Swiss-Prot record:
Keyword Glycoprotein listed: no
Keyword field: Activator, Coiled coil, Nucleus, Transcription, Transcription regulation
Task of the protein: Component of the Mediator complex, a coactivator involved in the regulated transcription of nearly all RNA polymerase II-dependent genes. Mediator functions as a bridge to convey information from gene-specific regulatory proteins to the basal RNA polymerase II transcription machinery. Mediator is recruited to promoters by direct interactions with regulatory proteins and serves as a scaffold for the assembly of a functional preinitiation complex with RNA polymerase II and the general transcription factors.
Primary location recorded for the protein, binned into one broad class: nucleus
Protein name (database record): Mediator of RNA polymerase II transcription subunit 18
Name of encoding gene: SRB5
Gene Ontology molecular function terms on file: transcription coregulator activity
Transmembrane segments: none
Subunit structure: Component of the Mediator complex.
């Protein structure tokens, strides 16, 4: 657990060289540390609804969890050059992290859950508590009961099953009242019910046909990728842990250090679904999340304990000094805390 103090900013692509040169002179780091992280965003697949009782505090909440590891594009990624599509094809690729042919591949994963930043009008910087756990996982292929879509296509919509018990009870009560009041109209009611049942049967047939078509399309697209009934062991681990994958993104950038302050300059990339056949086999085409080639900047300090007021005040002062020193280069600001809220909203 760490207590993180942070400020954020952004710069245009044309200001990247000037910003890097200034930070190199300011920090004394001629060769900044490269950043190449892959983040898998997961969500609890079972909603927990605590029983509310008077006189008891029920602040039990569920959170989205980030699973972070490193990635490589297999070539030198020049951040100084803009990422532009040429003839509809991407020039940025990532190797597949979850592939059916990979066996006994070890990767370091960081599981991260973050609380919403502290609220307040007099906050000088964003302050939030982050819980992390790092593990080394050996990726293998395991058998699964369900043959899901390609493991890298994590942006899937999971439909919830609706309860029909309440509707059936209401229909039964209505039928009883109608039978008591209108005994002479039983024949007409039966005819109407027969028509409704026939319509329902026809609708069910149409739905079954549509489901068969969808399943056949999925098997054609992904059967060669994942194999029948197999998937990556890390995805199986997340499923056993109670989480399902909902999104993914890649980060590429550089990192500077100034005392206890970490300064990161990076771009966010996502999967490019428009490129159906990448130039390089076994790799995924990527595109910028912000096509304007804007760089994101994040400066932060990690405090060991959220109760250490002296270190928190000292870290806040250091961030404010950095903000004042770099005000002519870029403006460091407090991010909106509502966009950093990772709590799962429960629908009542």
């Amino acid at each position: 657990m760490v207590h993180q103090l942070s400020l954020v900013s952004s710069i245009a692509h044309g200001s990247y060289v000037q910003t890097v040169s200034t930070l190199q002179a300011f920090t004394g780091m001629l060769s900044p540390q490269p950043i190449a992280t892959y983040t898998l965003l997961t969500k609890p697949h079972e909603v927990f609804k605590p029983k509310f009782e008077p006189g008891k505090v029920n602040q039990i909440e569920q959170y989205y969890m980030k699973c972070i590891t490193t990635w490589s594009d297999g070539s030198e990624f020049d951040l100084a050059s803009a990422v532009i599509k040429e003839n509809g094809s991407s020039n940025v690729f990532s190797g597949r992290l979850f592939h059916a042919e990979d066996e006994s591949v070890q990767r370091i994963w960081t599981l991260q859950i973050s609380d919403i930043p502290i609220a307040g009008k007099n906050q000088a910087c964003s302050a939030q508590t982050i819980y992390e756990s790092t593990l080394i996982h050996t990726h293998t292929n395991v058998k699964s009961e369900e043959n899901k879509i390609d493991a890298m296509d994590v942006d899937l919509e999971h439909k919830d099953k609706s309860d029909v018990k309440g509707d059936t009870k209401e229909k039964e009560e209505d039928k009883k009242e109608e039978d008591k009041k209108e005994e002479d109209k039983k024949e007409e009611d039966k005819k109407e019910e027969d028509k409704k049942e026939e319509d329902k049967k026809e609708e069910e047939k149409v739905e079954k046909k549509n489901d068969e078509v969808k399943h056949s399309e999925v098997n054609l697209e992904d059967g060669a990728e994942t194999g029948s009934g197999h998937k990556d062991s890390f995805l199986q681990f997340l499923e056993d842990l109670g989480y399902e994958t909902i999104s993914q993104y890649w980060i590429k950038g550089i990192r500077f250090f100034h005392g206890d302050i970490v300064i990161e300059i990076f771009k966010v990339l996502v999967r490019d679904d428009e490129v159906t056949e990448p130039k390089e086999e076994g790799k995924i085409a990527l595109k910028l999340l912000d096509e304007s080639n804007t760089f994101q900047i994040r400066t932060y300090i990690n405090i060991a304990k959220s109760t250490d007021i002296d270190l928190i005040n000292q870290g806040t002062k250091e961030l404010l000094r950095l903000q004042e020193f770099l005000k002519n280069l870029f403006k460091l600001e407090i991010p909106d805390r509502m966009f950093m809220d990772s709590r799962v909203q429960v629908r009542k």
